Amino acid sequence: MTSVQQPRTLAEKVWDSHVVVRGTGEGEAREPDLIYIDLHLVHEVTSPQAFDGLRLAGRQVRRPDLTIATEDHNVPTIDIDKPIADPVSRTQVETLRKNCEEFGIRLHPMGDAEQGIVHVVGPQLGLTQPGTTVVCGDSHTSTHGAFGALAMGIGTSEVEHVLATQTLPLRPFRTMAINIDGSLPTGVTSKDVILAVIAKIGTGGGQGYVLEYRGQAVEEMSMEARMTMCNMSIEAGARAGMVAPDETTYAYLKDRPHAPKGQLWDAAVAEWDSLRTDEGAQFDAEVHIDASTLTPFVTWGTNPGQGVPLGADVPDPELMADEEERLAAEKALTYMDLTPGTPMREIPVDTVFVGSCTNGRIEDLRAVADVLRDRKVAAGVTMLIVPGSMRVRAQAESEGLGEIFAAAGAQWRQAGCSMCLGMNPDQLSPGQRCASTSNRNFEGRQGKGGRTHLVSPAVAAATAVRGKLSSPADLAKSVK
């Protein structure tokens, strides 16, 4: 007598289909499962020691055809034809090139037409596909979950394990449904959604979970919007974030360089259509957010969970009942040099950064151009616009976006991680305040002493024009 398959979540389906060896034992004593990895993304920062480990053990890369590398974290976004000035950054980039050549790994170096941030390059090449497992030595690998992939950031020792075996020992995760019910109001983006989610559940609320984003608002999002949302799952403490594949997914993937072709495409779509959470499947936790109540969101503190609607005021720690939360807020406000009760819209900025693996895609740049068209960046404000890849830059140029950016007084750069993190020349100086479309606002994240407010691309552009945290609606009001 055959057993009846229990209803499963999307994450469970992908996990089960990739188990090479099932771990034994129960509870805390349970051994990890051995999971097969379909795609391994590599960059210059977390890979050098992993390759050294292969050499010491006399091993080769098991599946170089399932491994792809790109230079992104340390690369400059101007003068890319010149040697990298910082010796540590230069060494890491040169080491990646040598390692990829030695081990037969495909690399997209600076200046290459496909170079860019690893989490932008993978999807645009069609390498990220539904139902696959994706890993990278980078926290924001969760980006790829927008395609219905199980995508996780891993450490350097795990990078070595995947290079050597194309597998990874992992313990099963819990699952959490994030339901965004209803449609988003005009002017509200997926960046606002994920900031609101993190503010609701906290930076540790997703710890040990794979988040599945569901609901009408998610179904109505573009693939690039879904990538933004999944990208920041890690900021809620989650291991991964996922969205079930649908017609929007297939339309994005079709005809990408590495997407299946012809009959293989038809077979793939038929398989991908099964990647839905079954009716009756049980999540370990569920969260509901009414999309109609959301407005543009912005962070005020030093972690992504310290955020409020743009129309709100800087919170008062004295009104926070939880002592730990209150102490964290006091510390954050001291670092950010903010006074409780200050309207968020009255906070001035020195710098605006548009880019990163969160918001460096073509739709993000179009949103910025829509705001900047026939407007100027405010006096005293520096605006950097950095495409997530050279392909994104080329597309933006073909649409005339670069001309709009230049006319507004913004700096239009080459591809790279740029000001998302202080590992390349694009950094804040101590005390500078930045409205940033990136994913982390930790102390010193964008440069020692720099202060970061996380925002959507549209809010970033409006902020650049007004010189204070603003939405496009604020600019429209100022014209009347």
UniProtKB/Swiss-Prot annotation:
InterPro entries: 3-IsopropMal_deHydase_lsu, Acnase/IPM_dHydase_lsu_aba_1/3, Acoase/IPM_deHydtase_lsu_aba, Aconitase_4Fe-4S_BS, Aconitase_4Fe-4S_dom, IPM_dehydratase_rel_enz, IPMI_cat. Gene3D superfamilies: Aconitase, domain 3 (3.30.499.10). One of its GO terms (biological process) is L-leucine biosynthetic process. Keywords: 4Fe-4S, Amino-acid biosynthesis, Branched-chain amino acid biosynthesis, Iron, Iron-sulfur, Leucine biosynthesis, Lyase, Metal-binding. Heterodimer of LeuC and LeuD. [4Fe-4S] cluster binds at residues 357, 417, 420. The keyword tRNA-binding does not apply. Catalyzes the isomerization between 2-isopropylmalate and 3-isopropylmalate, via the formation of 2-isopropylmaleate. This is 3-isopropylmalate dehydratase large subunit. The lineage of its organism: Bacteria, Bacillati, Actinomycetota, Actinomycetes, Mycobacteriales. Residues 431-454 are annotated as: Disordered. It comes from Mycobacteroides abscessus (strain ATCC 19977 / DSM 44196 / CCUG 20993 / CIP 104536 / JCM 13569 / NCTC 13031 / TMC 1543 / L948) (Mycobacterium abscessus).
